[in-house]
């Protein structure tokens, strides 16, 4: 199985300006992300960016990059342009790794790509991890996902799903008699596998009302009838970088 890792990166960030170029132990963060991705079995890893500064920094560290337009309304549009620039075919698989995940597990990248390859009925794949703390279930910044019997996504939400009616807001998965037989809540991990043909189609689909309500782009795929396969990982995902505090924590791993 061959697949390509694409890492979208742009300098505009409201909470952390110039985030992709933030220094992490002598290399920009986007380079650290690419270096982790290059430890996967991907045939190639490419940064997709609208910044010549990012292109130059990647080149200095031997990381492939492609220059895209600056006016893309979403990361999906940027990835679709990158697929065309790279000459990828519609049946090829790409994995979208976020440019602010310098601790991404290479094995997780492989798992997401492999799952999509094994599920021809799905247009996308992603990952999830079990939730252990009630605070995370209730936190709207922690996106939850519920699955069907084949581990295909039924819905993603910022609200606590599933809602356990009989447990009065308590962590039912800690109930040794009844709750342990029920599904644990799952936290969505923001990594996506796409078939290139669908990735090219995705930006042309009208935004879904539920997507706008939840501010979750993946709901557009479900709304329009496309399936998303979900890999459940036993390893908690490494921390992403959205704020200066996140950056300080992540830098500890790159002395």
Curated annotation (Swiss-Prot):
UniProt xrefs under InterPro entries: Cytidylyl_trans, KdsB, Nucleotide-diphossugar_trans
A single cellular component GO annotation: cytosol
GO molecular function terms listed in the Swiss-Prot or TrEMBL record: 3-deoxy-manno-octulosonate cytidylyltransferase activity
Keyword set includes Transferase: yes
Pathway the protein takes part in: Nucleotide-sugar biosynthesis; CMP-3-deoxy-D-manno-octulosonate biosynthesis; CMP-3-deoxy-D-manno-octulosonate from 3-deoxy-D-manno-octulosonate and CTP: step 1/1; Bacterial outer membrane biogenesis; lipopolysaccharide biosynthesis
Superkingdom per UniProt: Bacteria
Gene Ontology BP, a term: CMP-keto-3-deoxy-D-manno-octulosonic acid biosynthetic process
Class of this enzyme: transferase
Major localisation: cytoplasm
Keyword field: Cytoplasm, Lipopolysaccharide biosynthesis, Nucleotidyltransferase, Transferase
Pfam families named among the record's database cross-references: CTP_transf_3
Location within or outside the cell: Cytoplasm
Keyword Nucleotidyltransferase part of the UniProt annotation: yes
Catalyses which reaction(s): 3-deoxy-alpha-D-manno-oct-2-ulosonate + CTP = CMP-3-deoxy-beta-D-manno-octulosonate + diphosphate
Entry EC no(s): 2.7.7.38
NCBIfam families xref list: kdsB, PRK05450.1-5, PRK13368.1
Functional description taken from the UniProt entry: Activates KDO (a required 8-carbon sugar) for incorporation into bacterial lipopolysaccharide in Gram-negative bacteria.
Protein family (similarity comment): Belongs to the KdsB family.
Protein's name according to its UniProt entry: 3-deoxy-manno-octulosonate cytidylyltransferase
Organism: Polaromonas sp. (strain JS666 / ATCC BAA-500)
Originating gene: kdsB
